[in-house]
Amino acid sequence: MATVYKVTLVDQEGTETTIDVPDDEYILDIAEDQGLDLPYSCRAGACSTCAGKIVSGTVDQSDQSFLDDDQIEKGYVLTCVAYPTSDLKIETHKEEDLY
């Protein structure tokens, strides 16, 4: 049985929305199921459209192939291929901050 974590998403206006995300589901998929409108493109971890930045907590994004080690160390995450591994808070809409 999957462990369910509380994932708080902070949009560009600072509005916080907390959703329950099982550890075997991608954050983006569950956010969409909850009616949230987050940016995405490839859904495969190969671009940066869905990028967010982790404020607190941890994820498993081993399926991603776009971010480099430096970006990951700074807390960037691709929500389309990120599984929560703890309760966490993510600032969404961070693609432009990567460059």
Swiss-Prot record:
Residues 5-96 form the 2Fe-2S ferredoxin-type domain. GO terms for biological process: electron transport chain. Keywords: 2Fe-2S, Electron transport, Iron, Iron-sulfur, Metal-binding, Transport. [2Fe-2S] cluster binds at residues 42, 47, 50, 80. The keyword ATP-binding does not apply. Its cofactor is [2Fe-2S] cluster. InterPro entries: 2Fe-2S_ferredoxin-like_sf, 2Fe-2S_ferredoxin-type, 2Fe2S_fd_BS, Beta-grasp_dom_sf, Fd_pln. Ferredoxins are iron-sulfur proteins that transfer electrons in a wide variety of metabolic reactions. Belongs to the 2Fe2S plant-type ferredoxin family. This is Ferredoxin-1.
